[in-house]
Amino acid sequence: MSQLSVKHLLGIKDLTTKDIELILETAGQFKEVINRPIKKVPSLRDVTIANVFFENSTRTRLSFELAQKRLSADTINFSAAASSVKKGETLLDTVNNILAMKVDMIVMRHASVGAPHFLAKHISANIVNAGDGTHEHPTQALLDSFSIKEKLGGVAGKKVCIFGDILHSRVALSNIFALQKQGAEVMVCGPSTLIPKFIGELGVKVEFDLRKALQWCDVANVLRIQLERQTIKYFPTLREYAQYYGINKQLLDSLNKEIVIMHPGPINRGVELSSDVADSGHSIILDQVENGVAVRMAVLYLLAGNK
């Protein structure tokens, strides 16, 4: 079996192009499995995985848990809100106590940038980063690449624009790294206040005009405004944001071109996307959710082979 070059999935930046190709190829095989009447395989039988989430999650947590069960792994779920973290226990103490129960792998989401990288220096178990602050969300980028490949036949040479709150998005950074490693052209589009100053150093195009960005791209990956991470006001109102940066059917129809619409969720309908776009034939948003299970199965399976 081919192996990944890494023991942990901490970020896309750490992966080689071959790593990404291996994950997506393996995910394709697992997608066939989960569409069968019997959806489980014994690949991770006797492997115990802890989902350690310090931030709220719906799609990512459910997707990881389902991926683990499809692989026949034993799964335990940790919620910070109901734990000794509330009593002052440190992150490392919390995780070491979980590992003392003979857990083999940690899937972690944390509000602090670099939290999984810190753990990787102190523990022996495999770690999967399910999102660290505004830094990276590697499995989201991998499932996005898988979905583009499935829809358009490949990623290389495609023009992908990431729209919205780039400044506070961990999805944006992971996608930029993943897309570039696979030969795609990448652009970001949003208000100047929500585009980080360093973004040009990553070799991506920057556009502030929504219509021009849509005319350029084959794929629009649309991000929500992350109000929970904003400490100052970056634009006057959500209504004004929607007026200048919201994608609606009328706008798409006027472009007279096919654009694939993606969104990592949750969608703020009527803000970054209108319902008639989110639910249209342009959208592969629910395909992304479906593909997330297969991609996370691939990540867990391949990491389990890299002790």
Curated annotation (Swiss-Prot):
Lineage: Bacteria, Pseudomonadati, Bacteroidota, Cytophagia, Cytophagales
Catalytic activity: carbamoyl phosphate + L-aspartate = N-carbamoyl-L-aspartate + phosphate + H(+)
HAMAP family, A to Z: Asp_carb_tr
Functional summary from the UniProt entry: Catalyzes the condensation of carbamoyl phosphate and aspartate to form carbamoyl aspartate and inorganic phosphate, the committed step in the de novo pyrimidine nucleotide biosynthesis pathway.
Protein name (record): Aspartate carbamoyltransferase catalytic subunit
Associated pathway: Pyrimidine metabolism; UMP biosynthesis via de novo pathway; (S)-dihydroorotate from bicarbonate: step 2/3
Protein EC: 2.1.3.2
Subunit structure: Heterododecamer (2C3:3R2) of six catalytic PyrB chains organized as two trimers (C3), and six regulatory PyrI chains organized as three dimers (R2).
Family designation: Belongs to the aspartate/ornithine carbamoyltransferase superfamily. ATCase family.
PROSITE patterns to which the protein is assigned, alphabetical: CARBAMOYLTRANSFERASE
Keywords from the UniProt entry: Pyrimidine biosynthesis, Transferase
Amino acids binding L-aspartate: K87, R170, R224
Binding site for carbamoyl phosphate: R59, T60, R109, H137, Q140, G265, P266
EC category name: transferase
A Pfam family annotated for this UniProt entry: OTCace
GO molecular function: amino acid binding; aspartate carbamoyltransferase activity
GO terms classed as biological process: 'de novo' pyrimidine nucleobase biosynthetic process; 'de novo' UMP biosynthetic process; amino acid metabolic process
